[in-house]
């Protein structure tokens, strides 16, 4: 043994341990002209609008990759990604401001396909102000 040496067990590391077994695999395509990168803890539902995928399936989920990692989508890239549900209190704040509260199905509202302001209502049951103005933060 050398001074400062760290000896670790040679076992597999299980990521997202304790998450619900409802893993979701979706196909994502970058329809924009710039690369887009999505981090491990980002609410995938709120990912860049240059990514085309079934956003409803991504609601309340993040990428099933190690913490700190990310997936990069080059222009025109199409890949399958695996998503897992958030654990804990299941409240999401920030990102694009589409949720800003609990992620439960009762709060979800839907608008016409392709509408840029699709998201969820706030805790008071009102549409988030950013959706009324069209500002996606």
Curated annotation (Swiss-Prot):
Asked whether the keyword 4Fe-4S is assigned, the reply is no
EC number(s) recorded for this UniProt protein: 3.5.1.5
Ranges for region Disordered: 113-137
Protein's cellular compartments: Cytoplasm
Which keywords does UniProt give here? Cytoplasm, Hydrolase
Q: Could you give one GO CC term from the UniProt record? A: urease complex
Gene3D superfamilies, from UniProt?
Urease, beta subunit
Primary location recorded for the protein, binned into one broad class: cytoplasm
A GO biological process held by the record: urea catabolic process
Q: Which reaction does it catalyse?
A: urea + 2 H2O + H(+) = hydrogencarbonate + 2 NH4(+)
User: Care to name a GO molecular-function term for this sequence?
Assistant: urease activity
InterPro entries to which the protein is assigned, alphabetical:
Urease_beta-like, Urease_betasu_sf, Urease_subunit
Top EC group: hydrolase
Pfam families membership: Urease_beta (PF00699)
The metabolic or biological pathway listed in the UniProt record of this protein is: Nitrogen metabolism; urea degradation; CO(2) and NH(3) from urea (urease route): step 1/1
Q: Which family does it belong to?
A: Belongs to the urease beta subunit family.
Q: How does it assemble?
A: Heterotrimer of UreA (gamma), UreB (beta) and UreC (alpha) subunits. Three heterotrimers associate to form the active enzyme.
Protein name as annotated: Urease subunit beta
Which organism does this sequence originate in?
Staphylococcus carnosus (strain TM300)
The gene for this chain is ureB
């Amino acid at each position: 043994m050398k001074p400062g040496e760290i000896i670790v067990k040679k076992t597999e590391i299980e990521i997202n341990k304790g998450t619900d077994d409802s893993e979701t695999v979706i196909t994502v395509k970058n329809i924009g002209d710039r690369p887009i990168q999505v981090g491990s803890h980002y609410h995938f539902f709120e990912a860049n609008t240059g990514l085309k995928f079934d956003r409803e399936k991504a609601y309340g989920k993040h990428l099933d990759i190690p913490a700190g990692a990310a997936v990069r989508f080059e222009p025109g890239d199409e890949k399958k990604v695996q998503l897992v549900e958030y654990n804990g209190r299941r409240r999401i704040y920030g990102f694009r401001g589409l949720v800003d509260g609990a992620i439960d199905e009762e709060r979800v509202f839907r608008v016409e396909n392709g509408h840029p302001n699709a998201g969820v209502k706030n805790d008071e049951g009102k549409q988030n102000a950013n959706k009324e103005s069209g500002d996606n933060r």
